[in-house]
Every structure is written in structure tokens, then in C-alpha cells.
Amino acid sequence: MAIANVNDLMAQALQEIYDAEHQFLEGQREMDQQATDEDLKSSIQQHISDTEQQIRNLEQVFEQLGQQPQRQTNEVAQGLVSEAQQNMQEAENEAIRDCAIIAAVIKVEHFEMGSYRGLVTGAQQMGQNEIANLLSENMQQEEQTAQIAEQSAPDLFQKAG
């Protein structure tokens, strides 16, 4: 897709984050199946619900722009999901797998926060306040998830010894 102006850039970024959210949703479902720590499972399940809402918010953004929701492959998301899957598979025990999961969650959340910050700024500069609000909602959910993950990581790593 040629990027001739800011609108094109925003459209591409939206398509990429839309794809990323779908990829991460599938990854979260896999993490939920493999996690053993109950608090970790609970936070993953909450984030699955949040991610489903974020996808709906992105669909509203596309609608407000008069576009059909469309996914453009997000290679960063592919890499993060692939790395998480590999680390979960190679973990020698459940506690190590839980550590691999929380580490992956933290990486993903920081990628998403950066993506949404750029999108919010773009929407604000284009005068698209309703769109900026929807994207800000997603960004705030990502920030909350990152905070929860970062707070729970030390306990998981301590359990893994």
C-alpha cells in the first residue's frame, strides 16, 4: 500500500494494529491453556475480554472512517507471538512456562502501548476526537494490563527459583 499522506499512514497503522490484536488474542488463548498459576490465568482471561473489546473499538474506528475493517499483517506481532510460543514449548516445567508467559505479556503490552500512543496522536492531530477517544480507551487497557503483569512477574519468577 502506497503511503501518500497522513490519512494513508493512519489507515495502514490501524490495519496493522487490528491484525496485531487478532494475533495477540489467539496467543492469549494459547497462554491461558498453558498457564498454571491461577492469578496468571485470571489476568490472561481478563485480558482476553479486554482484547475482544479493543477489536470492537477498532471496528468502530474503521466504521467512523467509512472503511471496512481490514487486517494488514503485523510482522512485529507475528514475531512476538512466535517467540512466546517457542519459549512456552521449550520451558522445562510449569513454573518456567508461567515466567515465559508473563515475560511475553509484558513485551506485547509495551508494543501495543507504543502503537496506540502513535495512533492517538495521529487521530488528535487530524481532529478525529471520537476516534482518539476509542484508541485512548484501548491504550489505557494496555497500560493497566502491563502494570498488572509487571507487578505479578517478580512472584512468578521467585516461584520458578
Located regions from the model:
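Amphipathic alpha-helical hairpins
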Residues: 1-161
